[in-house]
Every structure is written in C-alpha cells, then in structure tokens.
C-alpha cells in the first residue's frame, strides 16, 4: 500500500487543514483495505471466547492473535490480544482494556509473554464520558496480592515521572512456582477517546519507554499496550514508537519522511484491526513528525 500523504518543502509540512484532509483520505483508504482482511482473517470464536471481548466488533486476527499457553489448562486459549511487530523490529502485544471476565487471562498472558521483566502501557482512563473503558485489573493497595490460581500479582511500588503529571507508574511482582518477574505499569491518563493527546507528554513518555525497552532487563519482552478497545490509541502509540525509532536512529540508512506514516499504519492494521482509528490520531502523528523533523527537543522524563 502506498500513499503520498502530505507534500513537504524543506522538511516542513503543508498547512494543518491540508494535513487533516489528507488524513481523512488515508483513513478512508485504510478502512477499505481492512474490509478485505476482515473477510479472511477473523477467528471463529466460541461463546466462552466471545465473553472475553470488551467490544464485539474488535477482535484479533486469527494469524496474529495471542494464544494462552496450554500450561494454564484453560478450556479456551482465546484472549483479545494481537502480536504486532513494527518495521524497526520491536514486538508489541496490542490488547483491549481487561474486563471482569478477562482479568485472569490477561495476567496469564503477561506471565507467559515476559521472560524476566516487562512493560505494560495503559492509555485509557477507567471511565470516560460516564462509560466504563477498562476494569481495575491490578491490586490497588501497596503489597496487596491478586491471586490467580498459582500465579500471584503483588503491587510493590507506585510513583510518578518528573515533568509528566499524566503518568503514574506501578511496579508489580509476579510469582509462580517460586519464579519471580518484574512488571512496570505506565498509566497515561492524558489521552481523550478517539482524540489526540498533548504532543510533549506522550512523545516524552514514548521515548522513555522506548529507551527502557531496549535495556538488558526488558529487551527480550514484548511491550504490552492497551487502551479500551486496543486499537485507536494503542495503534497510535505503536506508530509513534516506530516514528521515533526511525528518526532517532542516527545509523539508519534511510531518512524518515512523513510519507512513511501511511505505510507504518497500514503495517499495524494488517496485524491489529483499526490501529490508529481516527483522523485526529493520524494528524497527531503528522504533527509529531513535523516537530521531530524540525529538530524540536523532547527531554526524557526522570524518575
């Protein structure tokens, strides 16, 4: 798939209204392209599997869906989660905000996906516009334990990142059969449903998580990211991560251009439906790219 989204002159995008018009055309094209995938890649779901979905119209593709490990002895191996590999090579698990019916399988997925230490990125508030968007799936009090069979989840620390008030970080310890794993949970609450967040805060957070994800403790684990449905905001985060990977890599042989964005989003959508869902989210990616190409500095937040 190839789009010529926005013309540039000296690395600067055309006016915002043109970007929005182009973004609308691209989203329309992506939606048409996705219809073909829906006809061939949707899984056949049992009633038990369907009960684990937050939204009936957002499900993983059969060829990219996460399957629960047989060690859990679940009657159904289904969870609403997709394995997504971005062009620069990093692997994500894009998933829905857990429901009361899927909290247990969510943590089982986390355990089986993370060798030693892992990262969860939460991009939705629990409630938005008076609607439940995500259930509380973690122990709330310090040192409280959530038990899921022989798997336990313990909250060991809560803190914020300096200069990013929208982010709360929780550290969990997972225990199973004497083996312990560390999970860092980044809760970003500055993103409106279907809209776009403040550029500085999300870009700074994404760059921080990108740096952390390549550190020795985390580099082999996929980044687990969710919003409510696990598509719009989740896809935008993954696209932003890829844009940063291309623009931050001084060794890259190919220069990043805004024309790459549509292909990045198309790649994501081929693995998780509706990744980057709205025109505003696509415009946000253009805006960030423009600021990066103009050399604007975004400092890493500190603990």
Curated annotation (Swiss-Prot):
Keywords: Cell cycle, Cell division, Cytoplasm, Hydrolase, Mitosis, Protein phosphatase. The lineage of its organism: Eukaryota, Fungi, Dikarya, Ascomycota, Taphrinomycotina. This is Tyrosine-protein phosphatase 3. It comes from the Eukaryota. GO terms for cellular component: cytosol; nucleus. The gene is pyp3. Its EC number is 3.1.3.48. InterPro entries: Prot-tyrosine_phosphatase-like, Protein-Tyr_Phosphatase, PTP_cat, Tyr_Pase_AS, Tyr_Pase_cat, Tyr_Pase_dom. The keyword Chaperone does not apply. Contributes to dephosphorylation of tyrosine 15 of cdc2. The active site is at 227 (phosphocysteine intermediate). It catalyses: O-phospho-L-tyrosyl-[protein] + H2O = L-tyrosyl-[protein] + phosphate. Belongs to the protein-tyrosine phosphatase family. Non-receptor class subfamily. GO terms for molecular function: protein tyrosine phosphatase activity. It is found in: Cytoplasm. GO terms for biological process: cell division; positive regulation of G2/M transition of mitotic cell cycle; signal transduction. Residues 24-292 form the Tyrosine-protein phosphatase domain.
């Amino acid at each position: 798939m190839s789009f010529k989204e926005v013309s540039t002159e000296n690395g600067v995008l055309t006016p915002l209204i043109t970007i929005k018009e182009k973004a609308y055309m691209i989203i329309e094209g992506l939606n048409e392209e996705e219809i073909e995938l829906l006809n061939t890649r949707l899984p056949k779901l049992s009633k038990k599997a369907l009960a684990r979905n937050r939204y009936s119209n957002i499900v993983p593709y059969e060829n990219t869906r996460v399957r629960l490990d047989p060690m859990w002895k679940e009657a159904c191996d289904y969870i609403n989660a997709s394995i997504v590999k971005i062009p620069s090579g990093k692997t994500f698990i894009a998933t829905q905000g857990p429901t009361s019916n899927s909290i247990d399988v969510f943590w089982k997925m986390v355990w089986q996906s993370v060798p030693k230490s892992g990262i969860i990125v939460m991009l939705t508030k629990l409630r938005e516009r008076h609607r439940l968007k995500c259930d509380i799936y973690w122990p709330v009090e310090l040192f409280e334990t959530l038990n899921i069979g022989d798997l336990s989840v313990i909250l060991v620390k809560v803190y914020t990142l300096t200069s990013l008030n929208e982010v709360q970080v929780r550290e969990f310890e997972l225990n199973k059969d004497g083996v312990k794993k560390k999970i860092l949970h980044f809760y970003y609450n500055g993103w409106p449903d279907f809209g776009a967040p403040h550029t500085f805060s999300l870009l700074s957070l994404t760059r921080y998580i990108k740096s952390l994800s390549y550190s020795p403790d985390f580099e082999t684990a996929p980044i687990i990211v969710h919003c409510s449905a696990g598509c719009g905001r989740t896809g935008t985060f993954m696209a932003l991560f890829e844009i940063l990977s291309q623009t931050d890599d001084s060794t890259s042989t190919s220069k990043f251009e805004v024309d790459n964005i549509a292909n990045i989003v198309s790649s994501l959508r081929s693995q998780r439906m509706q990744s980057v869902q709205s025109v505003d989210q696509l415009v946000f990616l253009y805006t960030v790219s423009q600021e990066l190409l103009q050399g604007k500095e975004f400092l890493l937040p500190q603990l």
